[in-house]
């Protein structure tokens, strides 16, 4: 049986009100990723969200039950994926999910993914990049990018 791991890398206050620095946030992620790699997890799924902290905190039914905060890091998935591959030996990396609208559109995303796959092919590895896309779940995530859902 194969087990995967889901990472919601978020810079939001914990239950004690502590907000980690970006350096601490990434250090925690890399430590957890290293442990998952050593323990034999199959895929490290990385969540991504944009501009959702305040809105998510007001949501009476949050995406992640009992968690009123950011669902995933606002970052370039491909860059984080390559760094994750560089730091590990066995685990695959996947996006959960990349918002097409909030990340430059479908053509820009296709180019990023193609480049990332090409970079990965030059590593001594048979590992895979798993990619999931979405059109964006919430209007507040798309509107700042000039996209007004119908």
For each predicted feature, which ranges?
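N-terminal beta1-alpha1-beta2 module of alpha/beta enzyme domains
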Residues: 1-87
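Flexible, glycine-rich active-site loops centered on histidine and acidic residues
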Residues: 2-20, 99-150
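Acidic (Asp/Glu)-rich catalytic clusters
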Residues: 37-38, 82-90, 116-129
């Amino acid at each position: 049986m194969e087990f995967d791991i889901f990472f919601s890398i978020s810079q939001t206050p914990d239950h004690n009100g502590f907000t980690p620095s970006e350096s601490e946030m990434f250090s925690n992620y890399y430590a957890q990723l290293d442990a998952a790699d050593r323990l034999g997890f199959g895929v490290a799924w990385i969540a991504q969200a944009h501009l959702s902290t305040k809105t998510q905190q007001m949501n009476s039914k949050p995406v992640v039950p009992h968690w009123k905060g950011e669902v995933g890091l606002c970052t370039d998935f491909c860059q984080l994926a390559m760094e994750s591959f560089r730091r590990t030996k066995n685990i695959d990396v996947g996006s959960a999910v990349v918002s097409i609208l909030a990340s430059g559109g479908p053509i820009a995303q296709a180019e990023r993914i193609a480049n990332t796959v090409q970079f990965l092919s030059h590593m001594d590895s048979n590992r895979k990049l798993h990619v999931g896309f979405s059109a964006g779940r919430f209007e507040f995530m798309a509107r700042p990018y000039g996209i007004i859902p119908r």
